[in-house]
Amino acid sequence: MQTQAQRFERGGATLVDEMFGSRADRHIVFLHGWGANRDSLRGIATLFQPTHHVHLIDLPGFGAAPLPPDGWSTIDYADLVQAYLLERISGPVILVGHSFGGRVTVRLAARRLPGIHAIVLMATPGLPASPLSKSGLRRWGIRTLRALLKLTRGLTGPGALAWHTRRFGSKDYLAAGPMRDLLVRVVNEDLTASAQDITCPALLMWGSDDRDTPPWLAYRYLELMNSHGTRATLDMLPHKDHFLYSGTGAHLCAFKIRGWLNVIDAVMDHAR
């Protein structure tokens, strides 16, 4: 497989794009999750090589891409990817985002760029849980305990906060290193308004056993999008977890995406 990787720089930030495929007029862009890189989506991306020009991207701070500037959020990531799309790609684009990459995809699709043909969100967070839900109550309890430990630091000592971080910090948080402040900002973002602004066709793909981004998020995204004019479809994959595209899941996900793209292309052709 012939591949070409190149850097794209804008505003002091850099992404790395690896391109391959046979069709110069149909582009599909893959955006990876937090703590991952373009290799994480290579298995599913290569399956689109016969039908699309494939773009595998390392977002700033991941893979071969250097750290982003201080103070970044998903808005800044979307700005960078948008600049890349406008400068490097001519023709309709399908965006496929997993987890964190899905957050960036939501931000981009909400801008209604004419070149974005459709989006695929895979196991994407970004919507707040109900305060009275199990996850909402747990989050409130964890934050309240941390606030109390900070107030009583003179009595409990610094070890109490360190214990709290080890006990309740996510794997991503514990491994984030210099990206930790960015991660905190990202996980506290609410993409509700952005989801409501999306008008292009959207496929939501989730694993029924996903504990990182539980299925209620998929149904909430579906509700938000379809109540505001989006042609959104949900495909819940039985017994799949957060990494629904891994292993044999790559072929299953690619099959589902291809089938969905054929349907929306037929609908659009009929509308013309």
Language-model-derived ranges and their functions:
Residues 209-213, 243:
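Acidic catalytic loop of the alpha/beta-hydrolase fold
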Residues 147-200:
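Conserved alpha/beta-hydrolase catalytic His-Asp/Glu region
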Residues 55-96, 246-251, 255:
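Active-site loop/oxyanion-hole signature of alpha/beta-hydrolase fold enzymes
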Residues 18-64:
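Conserved HGGG/HGGXW glycine-rich cap/lid loop of the alpha/beta-hydrolase fold
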Residues 197-198, 204-206, 210:
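Short beta-strand/loop motif that positions the catalytic acidic residue
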Residues 230-272:
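Catalytic active-site module of serine/aspartate enzymes centered on a nucleophile-bearing elbow/loop
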Residues 106-110, 116-150:
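Flexible "cap/lid" loop of the alpha/beta hydrolase fold
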Residues 33-36, 99, 125:
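Active-site glycine-rich loops that stabilize anionic/oxyanionic intermediates
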